[in-house]
UniProtKB/Swiss-Prot annotation:
InterPro entries: PEP_COase, PEP_COase_bac/pln-type, PEP_COase_Lys_AS, PEPCASE_His_AS, Pyrv/PenolPyrv_kinase-like_dom
Keywords: Carbon dioxide fixation, Lyase, Magnesium
Any one GO CC term of the record: cytosol
Keyword Repeat (UniProt): no
Family indicated by similarity: Belongs to the PEPCase type 1 family.
Record Pfam families: PEPcase
Protein name: Phosphoenolpyruvate carboxylase
Encoding gene (name): ppc
Enzyme Commission number, as recorded: 4.1.1.31
Cysteine disulfide partners in this protein: none
Catalytic activity: oxaloacetate + phosphate = phosphoenolpyruvate + hydrogencarbonate
Organism field: Xanthomonas campestris pv. campestris (strain ATCC 33913 / DSM 3586 / NCPPB 528 / LMG 568 / P 25)
BP GO annotations: carbon fixation; oxaloacetate metabolic process; tricarboxylic acid cycle
Length: 904
């Protein structure tokens, strides 16, 4: 049996997945025959078998090209959508299989819990000597915060996501072994209905989504998925603690959520003070509506009568206070529920919540007041035989209120440093501001940042826009409370002057508390290789600045620093990016500790490996010792949100994995590795030589022209994926101005995935030539950072295809001969050293499940990619004016994105 066929063997636990894939694949065939024709299905089968044969022989895709080229746009679009539909059902089957495997573990009753879950984490901690008292001391320090962003990487529209949820629900229902044949037939019919409706729904919206659309999109996951699973996460942790330690603990809040949607102004002119205010208002309405609905449902449970059961004196006293506070509501409720104190209090709590929603008299001043009421009910139920008469449901609502407050998710605001600099330069009348020394600028800013002097008001658009933003934040703090606001992030932060600038602008905008301090956490984002290298110096300067240090004392002597995975990779290649991020964390921690400041890292990770994606558990295991310390703040972008939080069971699993990983990394961090001192210079060399190779490639003359011809970047720029443009407004098409997301997306579509591996082979080869091969092998075996790095490169390489990348490259004409041989040679070098150092004959040999997932899809991705090359050539011949060809190309982009399971 050849390598390709043997790679498609399913392990015993995955046989149900194989059966689902076959069954759903047959269902797709039935769909195509019904919706198009039997001849169309036969053609799809012919193309599919040709693609598989091509994979088995590892030959150029000439046979595929001859089958696919020259098709009419609508016929091409139908073909692409047929293969995309297969990816859709395979992706769904795999997600449902994860739920199946989770249930298998839970049912097994063995002493081996599911890896990376909370039970697994606690058992490992106990085995390492962590006591219940130590766990109790640490839990209040745990703070896990996924932050949802609206980066344009979600290539599947909302209408299709909702239908996917219906398909998932029907498959999950079918997991029930007690289903009757009729019920299983109904499940299949529900799946077929949603699948057919998906086929009849256009893959992409004809208009670019607005900020409001993006807000609704993220709000869907927060209110429809995470809202429901948050209490279950805490219940799972309670059960795991009791099972592991034989005792229970009162759990503090461990999780909260953040969002950039409506607050990320960086390069997006559609985000401003109005979207900030509108987002906070919309989120408040959304979460209060959920509380109102849940209280309404609780009323049916809390029907206890005073003639049969008592209530606590504290609850009775609160009831009296509320009847005086809300006499009209009490008068309406008392005749019906006068003998039902819980229900009467519930009615009055709903009246207070409605007043909160309407900004009326009697409103709750803060979520803590609602929490207090719910706790009163819990305490009363507990002492009056009500543990099994509503206590459980009330506590679930309490966990939700603790997690979501009255704001749903904390809103971050982000803007680029140059925007602030231009505003201050105009305010101070200094046209040469950017050319002045950063230390000199910081000195000039000191009096304005401290409030000693007022930064002059200037009547221009840039200053007015920023003033409005800070005024909106001040108003939001009053209206929604401090918990509704996250951080103010400065992208492309280079020095302390960039941070002091924001402090001065915030004061001018009126964001000042009663004590005269600026109540804002200002976060520099280091996102280029050079800024990561210089980040320690910047933070040292910042923490030594008396004005900023005074500000920081008012913020609890805690400083957050955001690390950018995307632009650092685009700037210097993935090896320099990963190593720069690792070193920056170590050096920043040391610098902050010396100055008595607690540092928190905010990880700006994207969906793809290139942009810091991958499993959080492995990332934390590979992180520097002490860098977690109980806190994890990380962005969740684009297709990652759907993949991790689109299904309730998988959302719960994601939250458990993050929380468990933080507990492990914090309570029992990895022991120091003495050999790391010897390994760091080796990694320095790998990163340095990798950067030389990478920059030599992307910085070569005519490279950007080659990039624009050898990838479908021009199609991606025409797609309506998000509210933010693909490059910063008013700037040319240079690589430095192109955003990291479309940069990665374009190369992923071209199947070369250059940003995910280029230069790595050269870096490793240089280290070997310098006599470090034995060290590299030790690093791959014993250093989690390096092992994770190599594993990630292996995964990226597995998703690429050199033969198809060559088809794209030939679209560049004469430039193909200049650039593609370099790609081919560097790829061969990288594959060689990755496999050699990992001790593997083939990529992903250590992860057969992932290898199977990729190989299952590749024969179906290949026809779309080959067709994309043909369509791209024809579309460009029309100067990009043929809308039918463009629509077919957009379908190709969506299809490949579904197949490789990431975009940017």
């Amino acid at each position: 049996m050849n390598e390709y066929r043997s790679s498609l063997v399913f392990a015993t636990p995955d046989v149900p997945l194989r059966d689902d894939v076959r069954r759903l694949g047959a269902l797709v065939g039935d769909l195509l025959a019904e919706q198009v024709s039997a001849d169309f299905l036969e053609e799809i089968e012919r193309i599919r078998t040709t693609a598989i044969a091509r994979r088995e022989s590892d030959t150029p895709p000439a046979g595929l090209l001859s089958l696919l080229e020259g098709r009419e746009p609508r016929a091409a679009e139908a073909l692409v959508r047929a293969f995309s539909t297969y990816f859709q059902v395979v992706n769904i089957a795999e997600r449902v299989h994860r739920i199946r495997r989770r249930r298998d573990y839970q049912r097994s009753g063995t002493d081996t819990p599911q890896p990376e879950g909370l039970h697994d984490a606690l058992r490992r901690l106990k085995a390492q000597g962590v006591t219940l008292d130590e766990l109790s001391e640490w839990l209040p320090r745990i703070d896990v915060e996924p932050v949802f962003t609206a980066h344009p990487t979600e290539a599947v529209r909302r209408a299709l996501l909702e239908k996917e949820q219906l398909m998932v629900a029907s498959l999950v229902d079918n997991l029930d072994g007690m289903r009757t044949p009729n019920e299983r037939a109904t499940d299949a019919a529900r799946f077929r209905m949603a699948l057919t409706a998906s086929w009849q729904t256009a893959d992409s919206s004809p208009v670019r989504p607005t900020v409001e659309d993006e807000r609704e999109h993220v709000g869907f996951y927060l209110t429809q998925v995470l809202y429901r699973v948050i209490p279950v996460m805490y219940e799972t942790l309670e059960h795991a603690i009791e099972e592991t330690y034989g005792s229970t603990l009162a759990l503090p809040r461990l999780l909260r959520f953040g969002t950039w949607v409506g607050g990320d102004m960086d390069g997006n002119p559609n985000v401003d003070a109005h979207t900030i205010a509108g987002t906070l208002d919309a989120q408040r309405r959304a979460v209060l509506d959920r509380y109102l609905n849940e209280l309404w449902q609780l009323a049916s449970l809390l029907s206890q009568s005073t003639t049969l059961v008592a209530v606590s004196p504290a609850l009775s006293a609160q009831l009296e206070r509320y009847q005086a506070l809300l006499p009209d509501a009490a008068a309406r409720s008392r005749p019906r529920h006068g003998d039902m104190p819980y229900r009467l209090l519930n009615d009055l709590m709903r009246a207070r919540l409605q007043a909160t929603l309407d900004d009326a008299d009697g409103a709750y001043a803060a979520p803590a007041e609602l929490e207090h009421d719910l706790q009163l009910i819990l305490d009363s139920l507990e002492v009056n035989k009500g543990l099994h008469a509503g206590w459980f449901a009330v506590r679930r609502l309490l966990w939700r209120v603790r997690s979501f407050g009255f704001h749903l998710a904390r809103l971050d605001v982000r803007q680029e440093s140059s925007v602030h600099a231009r505003a201050v330069a105009d305010a101070l009348g200094q046209a040469d501001w950017d050319s002045q020394d950063a230390t000199h600028r910081a000195g000039l800013l000191g009096p304005y940042a401290s409030g000693e002097q007022a930064l002059p008001q200037v009547d221009d658009e840039g200053n007015a826009r920023l003033d409005a933003v800070f005024a909106a934040l001040a108003d939001a703090r009053t209206r929604h409370g401090a918990d509704a606001l996250g951080s103010y992030i400065i992208s492309m932060a280079h020095n302390r002057a960039d941070v002091l600038t924001v402090l001065a602008l915030a004061r001018r905008g009126g964001l000042v508390d009663d004590a005269g301090a600026v109540p804002l956490d200002i976060v520099p984002l280091f996102e280029t290789v050079d800024d990561l290298r210089g980040g320690t110096g910047t933070v040292q300067d910042l923490l030594a600045d008396p004005v900023y240090r005074q500000h920081l004392r008012a913020r609890g002597d805690t400083q957050m620093v955001m690390l950018g995975y995307s632009d650092s990779g685009k700037d210097g290649g993935i090896a320099a990016s990963r190593w720069g991020l690792q070193r920056a964390q170590v050096e920043l921690l040391e610098a902050a500790a010396e100055l008595g400041v607690r540092l928190t890292f905010f990880h700006g990770r994207g969906g793809s490996i290139v942009r810091g994606g991958g499993k959080t558990t492995r990332a934390l295991d590979a992180a520097p010792r002490g860098s977690v310390d109980g806190r994890l703040r990380v962005t969740e972008q684009g297709e990652v949100i759907h993949r991790k939080y689109g299904i309730r069971a998988l959302a719960l699993r994601s939250l458990e994995q993050m929380t468990g990983a933080v507990l492990l990394s914090s309570l029992r961090p990895r022991a120091p590795e003495p050999r790391e001192d010897a390994w760091r210079p080796v990694m320095d060399l790998v990163a340095e030589r990798s950067t030389v190779a990478y920059r030599g490639f992307v910085g070569a003359p005519d490279f950007m022209q080659y990039f624009r011809l050898a990838t479908p970047i021009d199609v991606i720029e025409r797609m309506t994926l998000g509210s933010r443009p693909s490059r910063r407004l008013g700037q040319d098409a240079a690589l430095s101005n192109l955003r990291a997301i479309p940069w990665v997306f374009a190369w992923s579509q071209a199947r070369a995935v250059i940003p995910g591996w280029y230069g790595v082979g050269s870096g490793l080869q240089a280290a070997v030539e310098a006599g470090h091969e034995d060290s590299l092998r030790e690093m791959a075996q014993d250093w989690p950072f390096f092992r994770t790095f190599l594993d990630d490169i292996a995964m990226v390489l597995s998703k690429g295809d050199l033969n198809i990348a060559e088809l794209f490259s030939r679209l560049a004409g004469p430039l193909h001969a200049r650039f593609f041989p370099r790609i081919r040679d560097e790829l061969a070098l990288t594959k060689h050293w990755v496999k050699t150092l990992l001790g593997q004959r083939s990529l992903l040999q250590h992860d057969p499940r992932l290898a199977l997932s990729i190989r299952l899809r590749n024969p179906y991705i290949d026809p779309i990619s080959v067709l994309q090359v043909d369509l791209l050539q024809r579309w460009r011949a029309t100067d990009g004016e043929d809308e039918e060809l463009l629509r077919a190309l957009v379908a190709c982009v969506n299809g490949v994105a579904q197949g490789v399971q990431n975009t940017g």
